[in-house]
């Protein structure tokens, strides 16, 4: 017998930065940047977070700056 697929509408991800009207992504705002980093310390992709391409580029730059300044770890401490 063939298995049936369960359908269902997936909820569209919302760009957190655009929804909260954040104009400038500051590298010193580690609380915001932590939302977009995995527990292993990797930057989460757009398909997971739902950010737009423009905001994802800004996020990546801010996270890399924060890492260089020592505000965020490069890898997690397990």
From Swiss-Prot:
The keyword DNA damage does not apply. One of its GO terms (biological process) is translation. Keywords: Ribonucleoprotein, Ribosomal protein, RNA-binding, rRNA-binding. It comes from the Bacteria. The keyword rRNA-binding applies. InterPro entries: Ribosomal_bS18, Ribosomal_bS18_CS, Ribosomal_bS18_sf. One of its GO terms (cellular component) is cytosolic small ribosomal subunit. GO terms for molecular function: small ribosomal subunit rRNA binding; structural constituent of ribosome. PANTHER family: 30S RIBOSOMAL PROTEIN S18 (PTHR13479), SMALL RIBOSOMAL SUBUNIT PROTEIN BS18M (PTHR13479:SF40). Part of the 30S ribosomal subunit. Forms a tight heterodimer with protein bS6. Binds as a heterodimer with protein bS6 to the central domain of the 16S rRNA, where it helps stabilize the platform of the 30S subunit. Belongs to the bacterial ribosomal protein bS18 family. NCBIfam families: S18. This is Small ribosomal subunit protein bS18. It comes from Lacticaseibacillus paracasei (strain ATCC 334 / BCRC 17002 / CCUG 31169 / CIP 107868 / KCTC 3260 / NRRL B-441).
């Amino acid at each position: 017998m063939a298995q049936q697929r369960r359908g269902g509408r997936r909820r569209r991800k919302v760009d957190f930065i655009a929804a909260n009207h954040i104009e400038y992504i500051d590298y010193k705002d580690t609380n915001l940047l932590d939302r977009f980093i995995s527990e292993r310390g990797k930057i989460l992709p757009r398909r997971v977070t739902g950010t737009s391409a423009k905001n994802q580029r800004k996020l990546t730059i801010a996270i890399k700056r924060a890492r260089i300044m020592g505000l965020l770890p490069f890898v997690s401490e397990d």
